[in-house]
Swiss-Prot record:
Subcellular location, principal: other
Keyword Hydrolase in annotation: no
Organism: Streptomyces sp. (strain CB03234)
UniProt induction comment: Gas vesicle production is induced by growth conditions that promote production of secondary metabolites tiancimycin A and B.
Name of this chain's protein: Gas vesicle protein K
Other facts: This strain probably produces some gas vesicles from the probable gvpO-gvpA-gvpF-gvpG-gvpJ-gvpL-gvpS-gvpK operon; it can be induced to produce more under certain growth conditions.
Localization (cell): Gas vesicle
């Protein structure tokens, strides 16, 4: 009986971009979750004005950095929205 080995085929020309896409997708998911949590806290009145300002600036900075990284790897925002099949899109 012979066992058939499965090989993972990787394209060396796109492996860096594909890895960047995966990592940036996870970071974008976390960024969106943090943004939603911050909005809930602001709407709930849980934060001081200074905290609101700091969170807002931090989220804006993170969004800017994400844009720079997407540009560096030739990715568009929609490239980070993975299709999860029957579950629908990730983001």
């Amino acid at each position: 009986m012979t066992t058939q080995r499965r090989k993972v085929e990787l394209d060396p020309d796109t492996v860096e971009r594909d890895l960047a896409r995966l990592v940036l997708t996870v970071v974008e998911l976390l960024r969106q979750l943090m943004e939603r949590q911050a909005l809930r806290r602001v709407e709930g009145g849980d934060l001081t004005e200074e905290q609101e300002e700091r969170i807002g600036l931090t989220l804006m900075l993170l969004e800017d950095r994400m844009e720079l990284l997407r540009t560096r790897f030739g990715l568009e925002p929609e490239d980070l929205n993975l299709d999860l099949g029957p579950l629908g899109p990730l983001l």
